[in-house]
């Protein structure tokens, strides 16, 4: 799974890097501009809300299609209600990142796996084909 991390704190980037295993392809970005300049499409964007002078929520409203799913990672729990949209799958408070990040990434990975599965209904069984 290709994961982008849009987080302006290098300390938080390192926390995320240490929590996720090496089976994921991680790309880290400090600014919205860096993220937009990348030529990749991401399965998941781990997104901070406060990015210096920029706002992650406003960014997603303007650019919803560069990633399949979004999980916000922020210390601004009061903004949680403003984050949810069709492709937002969660909100992790930074103080609880060690408890929640791996589980949430696994949930996203399972969701992607389900979306990529095609059922073939054969006469005596159902077979699944994965894209």
Task: Identify the meaning behind each predicted range.
Residues 52:
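The feature encodes the CheY-like receiver
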Residues 103-131:
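Conserved binding/recognition cores within well-folded domains
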Residues 28-44:
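Acidic, metal-coordinating helix/loop segments flanking the phosphotransfer/catalytic sites
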Residues 57-68:
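Short amphipathic alpha-helix used as the core "switch/output" element in two-component signaling
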Residues 48:
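Active-site residues of response regulator receiver
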Residues 67-78:
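A short, hydrophobic beta-strand element within the central beta-sheet of small alpha/beta folds
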